[in-house]
């Protein structure tokens, strides 16, 4: 659900590792992104949707759902997909409120479903190297870490001034979008 930047990155894994994963459906309100991803992954017409609700109103047709929608749209599709028996790969943050997060957790437990949260920085070379240094003990016993993630101008202007996160009422505040990284 969602064929934008993140959804395309995760779908790219299916292209690289076709024995591990196959994209069998796509939902995106943007016709260009929908068509592009659907054609790239040979998704049949009956599994192309312009809304996540359309996709989840269809009888279950996959093992898992990737939810890479805007932050404020994580809860409802996640709860619906879990109730249908899907496993979930969920873009961070899980949801905007603590209650929504615990609802997702509780339903996943009830349905014995996996909800994997995409903490993408965990796999960035910088953080891998930092963890190796800490784990090696070369710098002694760690007492505290203070980390600043500078947001480059182009990313800030694109995402937080003009882009998807320009208005906290429409998505989530920048502190939630950025501070939920691992």
Which ranges hold each PLM region?
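Beta-loop-alpha module in the N-terminal Rossmann-like domain of NAD(P)-dependent dehydrogenases
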Residues: 43-107
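N-terminal Rossmann-like dinucleotide-binding module
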Residues: 1-42
């Amino acid at each position: 659900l969602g064929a934008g930047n993140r959804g395309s990155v995760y779908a790219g894994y299916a292209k690289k590792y076709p024995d591990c994963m196959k994209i069998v459906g796509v939902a995106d309100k943007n016709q260009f992104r929908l068509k592009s991803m659907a054609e790239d992954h040979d998704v049949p017409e009956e599994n192309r949707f312009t809304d996540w609700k359309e996709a989840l109103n269809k009888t279950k047709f996959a093992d898992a759902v990737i939810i890479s929608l805007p932050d404020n749209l994580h809860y409802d599709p996640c709860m619906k997909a879990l109730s249908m028996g899907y496993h979930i790969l969920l873009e961070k943050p899980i949801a905007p409120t603590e209650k929504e997060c615990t609802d997702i957790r509780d339903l996943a437990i009830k349905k014995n479903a996996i909800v994997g949260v995409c903490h993408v920085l965990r796999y960035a070379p910088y953080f891998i190297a930092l963890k190796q240094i800490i784990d090696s003990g070369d710098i002694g016993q760690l007492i505290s870490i203070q980390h600043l993630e500078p947001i480059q101008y182009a990313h800030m202007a694109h995402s937080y001034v003009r882009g998807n996160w320009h208005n906290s009422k429409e998505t989530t505040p920048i502190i939630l979008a950025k501070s939920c990284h691992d």
